[in-house]
A protein has these predicted regions:
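Two-component/phosphorelay signaling modules centered on CheY-like receiver
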Residues: 3, 15-33, 46
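The feature encodes the CheY-like receiver
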Residues: 18, 59-60, 77, 89, ...
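Receiver (REC) domain active-site loop signature in two-component systems and cognate sites
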Residues: 58, 96
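C-terminal output helix
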Residues: 91, 108-118, 122
Length: 156
């Protein structure tokens, strides 16, 4: 069932690159595709994917700008971003990581490496979300207990 699968947003302006990543990931994940930075931001805000695979070189809005915009938005800031790009030099890798990406994969891709990295980053993201929700629930329980204790002290 596709609704039970983790969601990946693939962002690339080249149909061939989208096809390659889709072929590698379609069996295990629910995929969405954006062919521009603006479209990627719209889809990410609505669908809240579990990870974004982002090309660095795109017209109008490049991958760095998309990543920075995702990280600046409260609803998308925690979604992990992996750059998947032909820009394989260290300077661009550093730019991508500085923009907020969790990983950087150079093209041509190795399907097993892409699958492994996507899997581990989604697991980390979901674990973080689970722990944040658990902590939030415990904070609420503590607040309730504190209010109850304070109300009891009024009667003492």
């Amino acid at each position: 069932n596709a609704t039970d699968k983790n969601r990946i947003l693939i962002v690339d302006d080249e149909p061939g690159n989208i096809k390659i990543l889709s072929n590698v990931l379609a069996d295990d994940y629910a995929l969405s595709v954006a062919i521009s930075g603006a479209q990627a931001l719209e889809i990410a805000k609505v669908q809240l994917p579990d990870i974004v695979l982002l090309d660095m070189v795109m017209p109008e809005m490049d991958g760095i700008q998309v990543c920075q915009a995702l990280k600046a938005d409260e609803t998308t800031k925690d979604i992990p971003v992996i750059f998947v790009t032909s820009m394989s030099d260290t300077a661009n890798e550093e730019r991508g990581l500085d923009a907020g990406a969790v990983d950087y994969i150079s093209k041509p891709i190795s399907p097993p490496i892409v699958k492994a990295r996507v899997k581990i980053h989604i697991q980390n993201y979901l674990s973080k979300r689970f722990l944040e929700n658990l902590l939030s629930d415990q904070d609420a329980t503590l607040d309730d207990a504190k209010k109850e204790a304070e109300s009891l002290l009024v009667f003492v």
